[in-house]
Amino acid sequence: MKLQILIPQYKETDEVIKPLLDSIALQQSIDMNEIGVIICNDGSDIFLTDTLLNSYPYKIEYYKGPHRGVSATRNACLDHATADYIMFCDADDMFYSVCGLWQMFREMNIGFDSMVSLFIEETRNP
């Protein structure tokens, strides 16, 4: 697997995380077999449903752990990662462009060790 997207989840419901998962599924010009998502629950009693987790064309791994805070939960996601590259997203993020991952894959194929990208606020301001 080329890229795994790591997402900590605390009290976010299916409705909160669905736009991010949808925006990953909408990415164009990439092989969905090269993408995986790892979501780690940070000890919350709000769990994502199997219906949501099984409705995407890429692999989603979901892990439940004790409440330790967002940094420890990101590290827990990292412990499960096996891809060549990793990306961190928050549960309420989403990809603005359907070509965002294609652009990242293009740069990965050049051989960069790390990449940084801009983000856009909810108001769509960079």
Predicted regions span which residues?
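Short, well-formed alpha-helical segments that are part of the catalytic scaffolds
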Residues: E12-Q28
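A conserved acidic beta->alpha catalytic loop
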Residues: I39-D50, D90
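Short, acidic/glycine-rich phosphate-metal binding loop used to engage nucleotide
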Residues: K11, Y63-V70, M94
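Conserved donor NDP-sugar-binding/catalytic core segment of glycosyltransferases
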Residues: M94, V98-P126
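Short beta-strand/loop segment that forms part of the nucleotide-sugar
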Residues: N33-S44, E61-P66
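Cell-envelope/extracellular polymer assembly enzymes that use nucleotide-activated donors
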Residues: K2-Q4, G36
